[in-house]
């Protein structure tokens, strides 16, 4: 039996990688437009980071993390999300001493042991943006505007933005008491996990995926009725900023997100009942991880889910030709000249491919066509004697005669 990739993982083959490169380049440019710079963090972290950051009672920590002991007996976890590592790097690098805000973006693989289904893998990839040091709701609106702009630029229609406020620790305490009072009436019907959450973190019950629990929380108290004046003012300001930016949204009082570090603003972008991007504010996470008290907000966008959405919407990602010129050859002497010519062209950043297989001219041209080369030329004895060669544009078959030695003239064709 041949070896296969582990369940829930997928190879990115050359025939598909151009789509990822296209999105990554677009995301980098958009992030730069907002003043964000890239951060890269390790693929694994100490488990304590996610226990403290994501939360002990979350599904991520309790059920989904890939955790193991290294040879020194330290508990290590493969990264299940991107925000906590970014915050850890921010604190460890003492970036809080720099002029704020600090704006970061990242591309990262994340690993979660989940049921494998359409658009959900055990290793998937996220594009994320995190902004540290700014507490005004205008930053929340700016962060939300980034995915809005991405979907618009890609031509993705039908995306819904849902927003909510889950308050701060002070007002959430009051809400938790009301929620527990409501849930106590149906305590026996809660799943075993939610019974544990009842005392430790009842808010997590609102995020439970078990059908009986989902049914119970349908009539639960709404958190927006319990948030303090400061959180209420922040949420009203956010809505005003979104209105100014002409960003359509719906208030969904049951969005709580599956990670404990969120406070105040939370949001989700949904298409066809699937969340394709989510985020919010996490004003207490930096301090929890060992830094100073400092506000922060960000989001994570699943790249595989975005690609699946583009496919379902029949939105094609343009594939650029990865070969500018195919250099065919006939005979050993011609092959030597082709090798030298290819080197000169590659030194000038012209993408070239040559025949190493000894194919016939007909087979070489078929290959040039199959790989999508923009141009082709074939050097043989006659071309070497005259110093002239026909340069063929593969798109329409148009040919022009060029001097083999006139590299600058040849370069102009590709610029």
Swiss-Prot record:
It is found in: Cytoplasm. GO terms for molecular function: ATP binding; catalytic activity, acting on a protein; histidine-tRNA ligase activity; transferase activity. One of its GO terms (cellular component) is cytoplasm. Pfam families: HGTP_anticodon, tRNA-synt_His. Its EC number is 6.1.1.21. One of its GO terms (biological process) is histidyl-tRNA aminoacylation. PROSITE patterns: AA_TRNA_LIGASE_II. CDD domains: HisRS-like_core, HisRS_anticodon. It comes from the Bacteria. Homodimer. This is Histidine--tRNA ligase. It comes from Clostridium botulinum (strain Hall / ATCC 3502 / NCTC 13319 / Type A).
């Amino acid at each position: 039996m041949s070896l296969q990739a582990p369940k829930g993982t997928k190879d990115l083959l050359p025939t598909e990688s151009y789509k990822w490169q296209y999105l990554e380049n677009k995301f980098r440019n958009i992030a730069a437009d907002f003043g964000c710079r890239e951060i890269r963090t390790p693929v694994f972290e100490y488990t304590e980071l996610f226990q403290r950051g994501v939360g002990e009672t979350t599904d991520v920590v309790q059920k989904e993390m890939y955790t193991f002991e290294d040879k020194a007996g330290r508990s290590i976890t493969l990264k299940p999300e991107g925000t906590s590592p970014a915050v850890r790097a921010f604190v460890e690098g003492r970036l809080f001493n720099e002029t704020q805000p600090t704006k970061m973006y990242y591309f990262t693989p994340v690993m979660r042991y989940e049921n494998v289904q359409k658009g959900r893998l055990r290793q998937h990839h996220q594009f994320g943006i995190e902004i540290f040091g700014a507490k005004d709701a205008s930053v929340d609106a700016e962060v939300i505007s980034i995915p809005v702009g991405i979907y618009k630029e890609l031509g993705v229609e039908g995306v819904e933005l849902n927003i909510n406020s889950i308050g701060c620790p002070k007002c959430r305490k009051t809400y938790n008491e009301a929620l527990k009072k409501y849930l106590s009436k149906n305590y026996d019907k809660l799943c075993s996990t939610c019974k544990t959450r009842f005392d430790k973190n009842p808010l997590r019950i609102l995020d439970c995926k078990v059908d009986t629990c989902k049914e119970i929380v349908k009539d639960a108290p709404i958190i927006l009725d319990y948030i303090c004046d400061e959180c209420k003012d922040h949420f009203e300001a956010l809505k005003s900023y979104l209105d100014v930016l002409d960003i359509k949204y719906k208030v969904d009082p049951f969005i709580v997100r599956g990670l404990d570090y969120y406070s105040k603003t939370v949001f989700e972008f949904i298409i066809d009942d699937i969340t394709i991007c989510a985020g919010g504010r996490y004003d207490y996470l930096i301090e929890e991880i060992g830094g100073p008290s400092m506000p922060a907000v960000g989001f994570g966008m699943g790249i595989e889910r975005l690609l699946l959405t583009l496919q379902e919407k029949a939105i094609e990602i343009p594939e650029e030709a990865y070969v500018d010129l195919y250099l065919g050859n006939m005979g050993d002497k011609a092959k030597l000249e082709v090798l030298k010519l290819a080197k000169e062209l590659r030194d000038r950043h012209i993408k070239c491919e040559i025949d190493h297989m000894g194919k016939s001219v007909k087979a070489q041209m078929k290959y040039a066509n199959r790989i999508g080369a923009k141009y082709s030329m074939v050097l043989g004895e006659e071309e070497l004697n005259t110093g002239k060669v026909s340069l063929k544009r593969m798109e329409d078959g148009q040919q022009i005669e060029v001097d083999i030695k006139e590299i600058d003239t040849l370069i102009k064709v590709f610029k």
